[in-house]
Structure formats: C-alpha cells, structure tokens
Amino acid sequence: MPKSYTPVHDSIPEEDHFSSDDESNFRLHRIDRSASRSQSPKENEGEPSILAPLVRKSTDFETYLDSLTEDEQQLLSASKDHDIEDLDRFGDGTAAARRRFSESKKRRKLLAKRGGWRAVYYSKTWWRTLVVVIIALGLLVWGFLKYASTRGDIWEEYDMPGPDSYFPTPKGGTLKHWAESYEKASKLVERMTLIEKVNITTGTGWQMGINSKLTISGPAALVGFPSLCLQDGPLGIRFADHITAFPAGITTGATWNRDLMRQRGAAIGLEARLKGVNVILGPSMGPLGMMPAGGRNWEGFGSDPVLQAVAAVETIHGIQSNGVMATAKHYIMNEQEHFRQPNEWGIPYALSSNIDDRALHEVFLWPFAESIRADVASVMCSYNQVNNSHACENSKLLNGILKDELGFQGFVQSDWLAQRSGVNSALGGLDMSMPGDGLHWADGRSLWGSELTRAALNTSVPMERLNDMVTRIVAAWYQLGQDSWESPAPDGDGGPNFSSWTDDEFGFRYPGSPGDTSAARVNRFIDAQGRGEEGHWNIARKVAAEGIVLVKNVGGVLPLSRSPRANAERPYRVGVYGDDGGPAAGPNICTDRGCNSGTLAMGWGSGTVEFPYLISPIDALQGAWQSDVQMTPYLRNAVMPADTSDKDLCLVFVNADSGEGYISAGGIHGDRNNLFLQKGGDTLVHTVATNCGGPTVVVVHAVGPVIVEPWIDLPGVQAVLFAHLPGEESGNALLDVLFGDVDASGRLPYTVGKSLEDYGPGAQVLYEPNAPVPQVDFSDALYIDHRYFDRNNINPRYEFGFGLSYTKWELTNMKITRLQRNPSRLPAARPPDAVAPPSYDANPPLANESVLFPPGFRILSKYIYPYLPTLEATTPPPPNPEASGSATDQKPHRTKPSDAGGGAGGNPSLYEEVARIDLTVQNTGTRSGQQVIQLYVSFPHTVTESSGQKSHENIDFPDRVLRNFTKISLAPGQKMDVNMTLTRKDLSYWSVREQNWVLPKDEFYFWVGYSSRNLPLGKPFDP
C-alpha cells in the first residue's frame, strides 16, 4: 500500500492555500498511483516519497519552499526534462511534453506566490485582468469618441471662454453696521501667528471632530478664539439627538407665511445653539428649482426667486436671532445632482452651468442678494462650475459679485470638497476650506492647511488676502455675539455636545484618524426641542399644516366631518390605502433617509435629520372620528377592487421622493427620472378611485411637482392635497386640514404642468454627459417655472401660487401711490465705503521653526494641520530687476468696483420704495380662513437699449413676475385693508451693457390676486 499522501497545501497558511481544483494537486495524485505499482510498501518505508512532503514546522510559504527536498524541488521546477521523461509510460514523448507544460505551470504558480515582481510577472490572473482592462478602456474610448462625433454640434456650442475675472478680493469691514465687529476682529487677528490664522481657515478633516460633522481646525488658542462647529442643515440639526425634524423648505415655502418662516428659523437657531453649533448650514436657496426633477429642490422654498428670497430672509433672521450663524447655500447654479461633483458619476470634472449675466442677476442671484441684505454670516459655494470655472474659485462670482457688488461682509466657505485648488481659490475669494481634506474624502491631504502656510510664506497668497480671510471669519463670530456665549447647559464647555458618528455617550475623540483610540464623552443628550405648548413640535405642526395645498375639492367633500352620517345598518367605512399612509420599519431606517419606505416626510441626503418620532397618517387617523367609524388600512400600493367597493370614503396616500446624488434609492440617482408618482402610485389611485363606494381623497407627499394627468379627472377623485414633506408632525398636521381645524391655506410654490416637457427644454436634467466637462445651458433661465408657461401660452394643470380655501374671498379698492417723483433711470451713484477696512502688515513672516511641527508633537493620521514638515519652498521669489521702482511701489491691477454696489445686497438706492399698492380684502364665506394676496408686475412692452452706434436692442421680459405677497387671516365677513410696496429693484432689469439695474421709463402694469393666473385686480403705473 502506498505511503499516505499529504496534500502540498496542507502545510501552507490558510490565506495561501491552493484552490480545490488546483492542477498541481491533481498531477501529484496521478504520479503517486503510478509509482505505487513499481514499488512495494516496504520499499517505500525507508526513504521519503517525492510525493509526500515531510512534516513542516514553518508555515511561512517562502520558508516552506526553501525546505523542500532536492527531489521535490526537481519535480516542482521541472528543471530536468529527463527525470520527468523517465516516468513516460507511453514512450513517445507525448506524456513528457504534457508533464513539462504542467510543471511549468506549477513553477509559475509557486513563483507567483513568492510575492514581489514575480507575483505580478507570473500571475496568470494579473495578465488576464490587464488584457480585460485594456479592452475595456479601448471600448470606452471608442464609445466616447463615437458619442462625441455624433454630438459634435453640441460640443462646439460649448466651446466657450471662461468667465470674467475680478481681482483682488474686496476686503470686508466697509459697512457701518459691521464696523464694531471688524474692529474687534482686527485687534484679535493682528495678535495671531501665521499658524493660528491658517488654522482658522482650514477644516480639521472629515470625521476629525469629536462631536460634529465638522469642527474648524484647531482654535487660535493664544488669543482665545475657539474652534467653530459647522453642522447641517436646512430643516434641523443633522446627526443630533433630541432635536426637531421640521418640515422641509419646500413645505415652508408653500405656507407663504413670513411669520411662520421666521418662527421655524428661530427654532432651528435655538436648537443649534443649545447643541453648541456655531454655524448652521442653511437655508438652501440653490437649487432654485429651474429643473422640476432636480434632486434637492425640496431643500429650498420654491421655484421663484422672490418667494425663495423672502423665505430665505425670514429663515436667516430667525436663525441669527439666537446668535447662530446662518449659511446661504449653494452659491450658485447648483440645479441638478447628476455630474455636480467631480468623480461622483465616473467623470473627472463637475458640470458647468452656463448662464448669461442678466438671468444670473434677475433670477438666481436674487435670493442671495436679499440674504446678504439680511446680514447672513456665511455663504457656501457649490460643487459645480459656472461658465466653466469652479464656483469656489470663480473670482467673478466671489470677488466681483458677492463681495463687491453685493457688499457681503461675512465669509465664504466651500461645500464639502468643492474646493478644487489651493492658491487659485484663495485669490478667487474663498475664505474657509471645508472639511479641510483636498481633492478626495478623508485622505488627510489638504489644499490649504500646511500648503496655505507655505503659500503665505512664499507670497503665492498675499498676507493681505490671508488676513482678510481670517478677519471675515472672526468678524462674523463677533457680529453674532458668540464671544459672549454661555456654555450649553447643563455641563457643556462651549463646544458641541453631541456626536455625528455614534449614539453612545462615549466614543472616539478623532474617529477619522486610523489607529487613534483616544476616547471622550461625545454625547450629553441635551434636549433642545422644548417642552409642552412651547415645544418646537408646535411650530413644526403649524408649518406642516399651512404647507398643505388643496388643489381639488369637488362638492366640498373636504373638510371631513368627525361624525359622518352612518348607514343605519352598518358603521361608516373608511379605507386607507398606500404604503405612504403608514410607518416604515422605523423613521430612521435608512441612512440620511435614503429610501422611500412608509410615509414620506423628508427627502434624502445631507439636508436631513434623525426623526425623534414620526406621526404617520394612519397613526393620527386612528382616533380621528368621534362616531362609529370602521377604518380599514391597506398600507400597500397594490390593492384589489374588492378592497374598495364597500367603503364610504377612500383615503389614498402616494408619494415621489428624491435627494442628494451620493445616494441612489429605487432607481433614482438623486434627481428624479420623471415627474410621475413613484412605487405604482398612479395605478393605486386609479384602482381605488374607479372602485370606491364613496369619494376618493388623494394625499400626495412629494419633493416637488408631480404629474397627475393619469387620474386627476377621474370622477371618483373628488379631493387632492399636496402635503409636501411635513416632518415629524406629518399625520397630525394633515388631520388639522382634513377636518378643517385650520383652513386649507397653502399655495403652490411651483407650477404643476401636464408633462415634464411643459417646463421647457432648459428645465430638463442632463442625465448623460454631453462633453468631457458636462455642459448645461441655462439660456432660458429668465423664464423659470410659471414664467415659461406664461410666455409660451401653456395651460398648466395648477398654476404657481394656486391653492383652494375652505372659505370665499373678495378683493376690492386697489389703489397705487407713487412714493418717488420721476425716479432716475439708473440708481444713485455708488456711495463710498462707510468705514475703512482693517489694515495689517502686508509682509509675510519669516520662515523659521515657528511654522514647523513643535518637537515631540503627536501627529494624528489624516488630521489637517497648519504646520509644515520642512521649510522647503517657503522663500519668496526675488524681486524682478526689470520692474521700475521698489516692490512696495507696485500696485496690483484692480478691477473697477461695480456701480451696482455700495451696500448690503447692492446699491442702497435699489431698495428705496417707489410705489405702494393698497386694497381691501374680505372673507365672504362662512368659515374663518387665511388668504395669500400676491402682487405681480408686468414690465413695459417696448424697452430698448443702444447696442451700437445705430442699432437698438429690444429687451424681452416675462409676461409678469412675482414681486411681493402677504398672508392674512380673517373671520367670516371680516374686512382688512392691505398694502404692499415695490422697490426700485423690483421695477428694474439688469442691463448687461451698463452692468447696472435700469428702471424703464414707460408704463408698467401691477396685478393683484390669488395666483399667477388668477389676478382679478390690475392697474397701470408710470414711474
């Protein structure tokens, strides 16, 4: 009997085992059987078999190879053909050739396992992979070139120069109401070291704070300036415990209620302060909603620049009333999720949003200008490019428009990894780099940090610019009174008291640093929501209720009765249908709400929060009726006709979700694929409405407009409510409107078209790249949303500003009063700076050991430091001998300041009131209610500008534009006198030729009414 066979791989560490089908194993078995026929067991006992390796002590593979016997080595290397050929039983060399080939394969495998270059050279898998990669790359290039050849006309269309430049960056501290803060800041900054200045401008890196999404890299400890905590977001405090999940921005915009907008902002600000947050990353006013399918439209307030601006201003006032810095984001033209970030979609470049100067000013800049008038402390620049220049280094946008023309006094921070260069972004107007990491997440390599220290020393970034960056940040801190903040109760230390990365009380101090295990108390579980009737749930519920828009109500089916007339023989039967009507497996079941499960109360992405609780519609409906009512839930989107036919009332819940591009859910990659209901919602409504024994009421929870054409005209669909994204009080707020506890007073913050095409070619998301740098053309941007419908005579299903009420209204006695006599065509001359900005020593400090890591300094992996490892490349360049005069005599080129500037939000004369509109509003119905009075302006029909020596250019305008609104509450029969004003800017257009706002000297027409197409009052006005 042959000696027992020990497989070769039994003595190799587990990770180095051969596969079960390894051919070398099979060959050894064959040879073993062959040898056993010519040798007896006795003969084999005295010498080791070449087929059975000795017992090995070492498990290291290379040691194992070195310990092979000579016979084993000869077999494995196949170095002596005649030794193998002796085993040839066929005698014709065929078997020998096969064995040589087989042993050569074994040799390659063994050498491949030795590591190093041999592992690569002898690895068949590696070579196969290389071939596949080369073929794939070839196909990719071929396909890309083929696509390019078919789309050449489009590529050529975008072969355009970049934007105008604006240098140097205007200094902050030129407006009187910021003067005191800048004076304090300058005294602090002039005492800072270079290291401290850089430290303030650069984030510490992703997950490098113990408590927050991000903490600005270390404090300026020597002068007492703290680290600052920046935290999302637009509808509450992201990642935090014991906070309120407020209704989303789109719901807030649908209230058209300035007071509620401010209350919501104040509550968010108070919760941020109690949680130790210095800067809240909201409100969002970009995207504006040019593309109705845009993934993050729901974070903003609606698809109109004036509505968006009013809501943003009220939110900012609310947040900053509690001493927390608000952030106006995303600046600017961040209108879709596809291709907004480099590398996120497999393309190395972010898309470019291409926009003309007039549309930029009149549409997309409008909310930002108003936010700056409201003294917003921070502006966040966006990921995308604008006219082929990254938004976070676009000097025209940051220096020219934001800091010069609009007079922004706060600081510009990058969106997380939106910074794409070091020196260019500093010179272009960026003041703070977030999260500190450079071109890739959590790699510990910053474009600023130590590189900004080096750039300041070698004068690539002038000290004048660095000092302004730091001063802007510190001045904003003083402006909000954060120098006098008390420590958060009960035992805070002035910093954030919650963790973004764990729900446990104790956790890692630097969770983003591999290998660091230092721990700290990271969660103090401080309740910031408020208690009882003063709790913030009450504000959330009011906003959610007033954000519900009633768009259809046949026969007054709503409001519902809590005591419906029951059939004498059976109880009143109510069916509740749809997954959206019930709870999910948990309100926070998906990270950043990245799934559509259960009732939809917010979209997904970084603009979300953790629900402390979520009242679903079915939860609220359980105790809604007072009489004998039998309610049966069918919380699924597939129902049978038999489930509906015996019901006296059918409530159908459907939705449409979207969010940020880093999450994909249900086949939606950020931006919606279309405007239809999701998860079979259209079929569900059709099935229920055509079979229900009574009226069908449809409730739509959606991130924006949805196409309702498949079912809106069905006789069974008697009421429809757009409930938007209502937050934690979803079900309770819905019942307030369903049963008439409050009036249906929401109004659409967008237009509901009959198809996606109704919104125009410029409103379509770019789903496939059309160039190496994807290009999105906003040539129709002046005609956003309802303006496009009006210009092209398209009948929408429901127009912008539309919404039904439970009562009736009448508008009368419209009167226009001139507040200025013969106002000039152009605004007044730009006023000089009210105060001089701070001045510092412009010379860089000496490059010495003060900028190096201190001796014995403990360096955390991936943490962003301002220190340099060496003094390499810190020497300023020598002066140019050909330049005349000394270096200090040389003055850099300075772009001429804008005539449209001179104050917060622009030239102060732009905001002088030129007209007042008075009217009387009466509630002529039988119920108390609320009404939104909307004021629209039509510009003169013929406005021309000189475009040359002889020719004149006709200036085109939208049919009418929203310019003001107010919301009132009246009892039955009650009257109220209402007035609204218009400013010079409201009646001006942006002249590209004159680079200023121009007031046409011809007849305007002012409209007053209930929506963009229901305007019963109107009068001409000649300024």
Curated annotation (Swiss-Prot):
Keywords: Carbohydrate metabolism, Cell membrane, Cellulose degradation, Glycoprotein, Glycosidase, Hydrolase, Membrane, Polysaccharide degradation, Signal-anchor, Transmembrane, Transmembrane helix
Chain intervals for the UniProt region annotation (Disordered): 1-51, 485-515, 822-841, 873-909
Active site: 415
Cell location: Cell membrane
EC identifiers of the protein: 3.2.1.21
Sites carrying sugar chains: 199, 387, 458, 497, 848, 964, 979
InterPro entries to which the protein is assigned, alphabetical: Cellulose_deg_GH3, Fn3-like, Glyco_hydro_3_C, Glyco_hydro_3_C_sf, Glyco_hydro_3_N, Glyco_hydro_3_N_sf, Glycoside_hydrolase_SF, Ig-like_fold
Topology in the lipid bilayer: Single-pass type II membrane protein
Catalytic activity: Hydrolysis of terminal, non-reducing beta-D-glucosyl residues with release of beta-D-glucose
GO annotation, cellular component aspect: plasma membrane
GO MF assignments: beta-glucosidase activity
Keyword Ligase: no
Task of the protein: Beta-glucosidases are one of a number of cellulolytic enzymes involved in the degradation of cellulosic biomass. Catalyzes the last step releasing glucose from the inhibitory cellobiose.
Protein name: Probable beta-glucosidase E
Species in which this protein is naturally found: Emericella nidulans (strain FGSC A4 / ATCC 38163 / CBS 112.46 / NRRL 194 / M139) (Aspergillus nidulans)
